[in-house]
């Protein structure tokens, strides 16, 4: 069943398109040599070009072009060997030139596609209309002074890739899945870090509603939404607002809006401009951008294994389920961690421990895989202790917690705390004898046919051995000692 919102006049379908602004990973800006490091002192990374000084000419950054091409290739998109930069004219305080250098009619990357997977397991293909390069603007800061707004131009001139989707999404979930998949691809490619909290990936959300089978109605754009969760909330809030207007007999105005997360509503920012309002014309200070086919092919040869291909390989080579492989490939570092641990080991055992206790401790301690005190080598050591029966699974859980809390290796913790599994059959028999003697009534019930009491005896023996008994040996010895139920 497709996603709809029920109004007073029936079901409404959502039509969603996303324009994602992804900051290019590059040491310098798109048209100047100024640095791009996040968090630098305000206005400490600004060249005369970025500040819009008269007579300063832009010089294209080859690496930014290469990053855009890599991204296009990663999106299975058409690379345009000839593209052109244009001036997009508008006034804003943090745009010192009075125009933005962008690409309008002739973008560097054409049509492509992304396949997304929903929680239900259903897959959908979302079309990519285009990717173009453009300059970012500076940043207006309204909370630094009681009566003035301040401008930080560090971001001015930083290279952005604007990745425009087709209006193919029909629910907040699909939009969220699209953004997560796009961010994962960009991170694998190394072309954008995807850190929405730092502003290096931002989304403009286009939303309209219609009855099933109708043509598209008027859309509104929600600007600069900076988290996937907020994108999903903004879509639902804006769709409900538009439905109320249509059902009341009104019309939706094409406009740009902002999302207020605290109130869960969108509010009007300005009337939505059309392309002619920006008076686009070819950038006179830059020649058309002409790429050689051989150069594009050389970039294609450097592409890493992308998420979909990696997932298929993990399923094939390691016997993982689609769900397990999908979790691991969401972040390249997670997939690499898994492969390192799984090399030469039982892959299903590794997957179970990573998806269970290991991820749980990452969440508990607020650490990432990169900063975790439990490295791939150390997790592998712990799993080896389970495999060779030095410790059992219950003890291993305790050891893993101690590894996170102390930073010590598994072997050192097991030795220091005397946690080695007991495999001495004499010690196991002695523990069983004590438990049986203390629970004569339970033994009588077991002998009378209450077979579930076998688990009780196993638990009591393990408790008597402080969890160190080898479970298989305990089960074997217990069956030998107390026999079958009802016997």
Curated annotation (Swiss-Prot):
Keywords for this protein: ATP-binding, Ligase, Nucleotide-binding, Protein biosynthesis
Keyword Nucleotide-binding on entry: yes
Any one GO BP annotation for this protein: glutaminyl-tRNAGln biosynthesis via transamidation
Keyword Protein biosynthesis: yes
Assigned EC number: 6.3.5.-
Gene3D superfamilies in UniProt: 1.10.10.410, GatB domain, N-terminal subdomain (1.10.150.380)
Membrane-spanning parts: none
GO molecular function: asparaginyl-tRNA synthase (glutamine-hydrolyzing) activity; ATP binding; glutaminyl-tRNA synthase (glutamine-hydrolyzing) activity
Catalytic activity, reaction form: L-glutamyl-tRNA(Gln) + L-glutamine + ATP + H2O = L-glutaminyl-tRNA(Gln) + L-glutamate + ADP + phosphate + H(+); L-aspartyl-tRNA(Asn) + L-glutamine + ATP + H2O = L-asparaginyl-tRNA(Asn) + L-glutamate + ADP + phosphate + 2 H(+)
SUPFAM superfamilies: GatB/YqeY motif, Glutamine synthetase/guanido kinase
Subunit description: Heterotrimer of A, B and C subunits.
Membership in a protein family: Belongs to the GatB/GatE family. GatB subfamily.
Function field: Allows the formation of correctly charged Asn-tRNA(Asn) or Gln-tRNA(Gln) through the transamidation of misacylated Asp-tRNA(Asn) or Glu-tRNA(Gln) in organisms which lack either or both of asparaginyl-tRNA or glutaminyl-tRNA synthetases. The reaction takes place in the presence of glutamine and ATP through an activated phospho-Asp-tRNA(Asn) or phospho-Glu-tRNA(Gln).
HAMAP family with a match to the protein in the record: GatB
Protein name per Swiss-Prot or TrEMBL: Aspartyl/glutamyl-tRNA(Asn/Gln) amidotransferase subunit B
Species of provenance: Acidiphilium cryptum (strain JF-5)
Gene that produces this protein: gatB
